[in-house]
């Protein structure tokens, strides 16, 4: 990145900042607008602020379904996941499991009381939960969070102990790369469910995941 690297908090970033390359984990709308202006003026921003906006969950859900990417249906018999649609989960209550339609309706009402009217609904898919981390250059790793116990909000427990079902790893990587191209991000990660039959479903995708399990390697 050169000989001079400066770190700055997202809320302190301003139009006066000047650099050739911006490595950004920003999510605030104001900051993204500033970064888009930097991109428009020729600066390299990783991840692109335009790409980060396209990772908004409700927008991405529509795009993935239109492109035929394997994602859970909105109807199912094993419960539902209600997910805040305007951003990635920042709080435990932003992604909620509902055992049936009645509970889903209750949780949607709870979202409205919190001022949240943008959401998506995904049917729960039984199977192994895997988390993947990737960089556009070809780096791709996946892990079973229920093997190491590392969890952000504990929702991983809903899928139980990993059975390590066989699946097409190259296919998962190719699908993740397709989503990265659709959104325009270079550093990304997400979650997928692997069913007993070996099928996989993308249940989450985001820019700049934690890389907690492979940070040094990445």
Q: What role is predicted for each listed range?
A:
Residues 32-35, 57, 91-93, 131, ...:
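Short glycine-/acidic-enriched loop or helix-start segments at secondary-structure transitions
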Residues 98-183:
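Phosphate-binding site of ATP-dependent enzymes
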Residues 27, 85, 124-125, 133, ...:
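Anionic group-transfer/hydrolysis microenvironments
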Residues 218:
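Catalytic phosphate/metal-binding cores of nucleic-acid and nucleotide-processing enzymes, i.e., regions
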Residues 80-103:
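Conserved anion/nucleotide-ligand pocket segment
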Residues 81, 118-121, 187-190:
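A short linear hydrophobic-aromatic micro-motif
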Residues 180-215:
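Conserved metal-phosphate-binding beta-hairpin within the catalytic cores
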Residues 1-75, 87-88:
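Conserved N-proximal alpha/beta basic substrate-recognition cap immediately N-terminal to
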């Amino acid at each position: 990145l050169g000989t001079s690297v400066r770190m700055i908090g997202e809320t302190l970033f301003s139009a006066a900042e000047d650099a050739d390359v911006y490595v950004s984990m920003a999510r605030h709308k104001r900051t993204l607008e500033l970064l888009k202006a930097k991109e428009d003026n020729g600066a390299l921003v990783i991840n692109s602020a335009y790409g980060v906006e396209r990772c908004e969950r409700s927008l991405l859900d529509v795009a993935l379904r239109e492109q035929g990417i394997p994602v859970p249906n909105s109807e199912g018999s094993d419960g539902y996941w209600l997910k805040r649609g305007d951003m990635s989960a920042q709080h435990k209550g932003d992604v909620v499991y509902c055992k049936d339609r009645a509970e889903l309706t209750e949780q949607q009402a709870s979202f409205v009381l919190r001022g949240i009217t943008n959401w998506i609904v995904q049917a729960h898919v039984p199977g192994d939960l895997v988390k993947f981390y990737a960089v556009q250059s070809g780096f791709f790793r996946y892990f079973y969070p229920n093997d190491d116990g590392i969890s952000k909000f504990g929702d991983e427990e809903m899928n139980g102990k990993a059975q390590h079902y066989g699946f097409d790893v190259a296919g998962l990587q190719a699908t993740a790369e397709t989503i990265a191209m659709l959104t325009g991000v270079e550093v990304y990660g997400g979650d997928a469910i692997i069913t007993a039959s070996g099928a996989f479903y993308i249940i989450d995708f985001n820019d700049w995941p934690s890389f907690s399990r492979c940070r040094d390697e990445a």
